[in-house]
Curated annotation (Swiss-Prot):
InterPro entries in alphabetical order: Herpes_UL16/UL94
Protein name (record): Cytoplasmic envelopment protein 2
Major site of localization recorded for this protein: virion
Species for this entry: Human herpesvirus 8 type P (isolate GK18) (HHV-8)
Upper taxonomic lineage: Viruses, Duplodnaviria, Heunggongvirae, Peploviricota, Herviviricetes
UniProt KW keywords: Host cytoplasm, Host nucleus, Late protein, Virion, Virion tegument
Pfam families (alphabetical): Herpes_UL16
Length: 334
């Protein structure tokens, strides 16, 4: 039982960002979180509905008992998981979005036996709430310039998400379209990251391809809830890469207007494929992407439109929580 309490506490502390439930009041605090499937924690759900949801919808009710102290009720996908006494609970609002919070749960001491919690209503519909925006990402991230790259990455260990994205130092590092070029961006839906642009250029024509479209792997944590019918699509996550992408030459299959962001206008109409090279640590566009012309000639990518960003710790954490693949890479253990 102690092991179950420890694993649940670690999951709540390390994999959840919370939205405030309207049920919250002076005597009981209620929060909801939606997070992608964990590579570490298994809540051992049993009902068909709970198992059908492609993510974890987490609800917590926090009650301050006069004798026992903070008591916490935890539910996941509609199943009650545990009633427990916590050593302490700390709630901290996060800047930017209203109604969002980080919660730290102290050691779970024992079961809160005999304590009655009120019914925890599901969160209200938040389908209108947008995911992470490009403005939020750009204004909170650090631009890593070529001359500063060695110092910024020194002593850090990295994992490749794909050839254009890395995890390291508690942050997501990614190649991203510079602010000065966004006005000329030809309608990239979502985040204009190089990972997304490359995927749009080279993806296959099968809408159910999980490599190209990332089906049932993503959530929007700002909503605090994911329905069982959610397809798990994301137009912001940089994890998605087309099924043909790897070290080597990948054929351009569509969206050729995006080539203007990558190559000199003189040659862009002749680019038929992308030569993609993985790099073990964060680097700039010229080291990972080269164009292949119709006669096999290699042409360099344009440096100016693309910057290397190190995302803030908070938004890196948020992006990892939204994606099953990023979690598997970044949260291998607690």
């Amino acid at each position: 039982m102690a092991s179950r309490r420890r694993k649940l506490r670690n999951f709540l502390n390390k994999e959840c960002i919370w939205t405030v439930n309207p049920m919250s009041g002076d005597h009981i605090k209620v929060f909801n979180a939606c997070t992608s499937i964990s590579p570490v924690y298994d809540p051992e759900l049993v009902t068909s509905y709970a198992l059908s949801v492609p993510a974890y919808n987490v609800s917590v009710a926090i009650l301050l008992h006069k004798v026992m102290g903070p008591c916490v009720a935890v539910g996941i996908n509609g199943e009650m998981i545990m009633y427990v006494v916590s050593q302490c609970v700390s709630v901290r609002p996060v800047p930017g979005r209203d109604g969002m919070a980080l919660i730290y749960f102290g050691q779970f001491l024992e079961e809160a036996s005999g304590l009655r919690f009120p019914y925890i209503a599901p969160p209200p519909s938040r389908e209108h709430v947008p995911d992470l925006t490009r403005q939020e990402l750009v204004h909170t991230s650090q631009v890593v310039r070529r001359g500063d790259l060695t110092n910024c990455t020194m002593g850090l260990e990295f994992r490749n998400v794909n050839p254009f994205v890395w995890l390291g130092g508690g942050s997501v590092w990614l190649l991203f379209l510079g602010v000065d070029y966004m006005a000329f961006c030809p309608g990239v839906d979502g985040m204009p990251s190089l990972a997304r642009v490359a995927a749009l250029l080279t993806r296959c024509d099968h809408p159910d391809c999980v490599h190209c479209h990332g089906l049932r792997g993503h959530v929007n944590v700002f909503r605090g809830y994911c329905s069982a019918q959610s397809p798990g699509l994301s137009n912001i996550c940089p994890c998605i890469k087309s099924c043909g992408t790897g070290n080597g030459v990948t054929r351009v299959t569509g969206n050729r207007n995006f080539l203007g962001l990558l190559f000199d206008p003189i040659v862009q109409s002749r680019v038929t494929a992308l030569k993609i090279t993985s790099h073990p640590t964060p680097t700039h566009v010229e080291n990972v992407l080269t164009g292949v012309l119709d006669d096999g000639t290699l042409v360099p990518s344009s440096k100016a439109p693309w910057v290397l960003l190190r995302m803030s710790d908070y938004f890196s954490r948020l992006l990892i929580y939204e994606c099953k693949k990023l979690k598997a890479l970044g949260l291998r253990s607690y």
